[in-house]
């Protein structure tokens, strides 16, 4: 048991010595923007079939990109987390766990989860973060 605890302590100390990977978005012109450590509030998703999903209260639908690829989300009446990758402007978001409270009628939690899973390209427009969905099916807009 002592050896196992010493091994775990060694791993912990080694991980603390590594530099943290930041969530840095790189545009096509080479400009970089740090989008990590910010609570991004979902404003809406505009779909390419002229429909949209728009939460009444954006603060109930958020994402937080943390160091080392960790993702934290607020899904209306639930919370969750997972992993993300960001390479230039290419992005993937993967939810690995959520709480399971029953949200009230009219909740957009399931649509928000679906849209996050479909995100493939990230870019900035002013101070807003945009996520283009796969198959050019739509764009999510987030504000600080």
Annotate the PLM regions.
Residues 2, 18-144:
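Lipid interaction determinants
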Residues 7-19:
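Bacterial N-terminal signal peptides
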